[in-house]
């Protein structure tokens, strides 16, 4: 299993599936299964009440998308998606957007 080049906080665009075309930052990554959650993308799920306090019903929960179904949004040209490359700048390895050759800011 290859290491993911997309990190938490990166702004991505969904390129496949029922949520195709939606854009948002990554809120969580499950590396072993290669799933990501993107802010603003939810699915409706029926939830049964567990005890007297909680209510059941149809709830919106964060959708888990496979990492291959999202692509990084180009930081320079927001309409395009790009692949991630690496370059050594001032002795540090930094992530680069391959289409625009701009450095990708890492969210912390």
From Swiss-Prot:
Name of the protein in its database record: Large ribosomal subunit protein uL24
UniProt-listed HAMAP family: Ribosomal_uL24_B
Molecular function terms, GO-annotated: rRNA binding; structural constituent of ribosome
Organism: Mycoplasma mycoides subsp. mycoides SC (strain CCUG 32753 / NCTC 10114 / PG1)
Record flagged with keyword Lipid metabolism: no
Keywords: Ribonucleoprotein, Ribosomal protein, RNA-binding, rRNA-binding
Function: One of two assembly initiator proteins, it binds directly to the 5'-end of the 23S rRNA, where it nucleates assembly of the 50S subunit. One of the proteins that surrounds the polypeptide exit tunnel on the outside of the subunit.
Membership in a protein family: Belongs to the universal ribosomal protein uL24 family.
Domain of life, source organism: Bacteria
Pfam families cross-referenced by the UniProt entry: KOW (PF00467), ribosomal_L24 (PF17136)
UniProt subunit comment: Part of the 50S ribosomal subunit.
InterPro entries linked to this entry: KOW (IPR005824), Rib_uL2_dom2 (IPR014722), Ribosomal_uL24 (IPR003256), Ribosomal_uL24_CS (IPR005825), Ribosomal_uL24_KOW (IPR041988), Translation_prot_SH3-like_sf (IPR008991)
A cellular component term, taken from the record's GO annotations: ribosome
Gene Ontology terms: biological process: translation
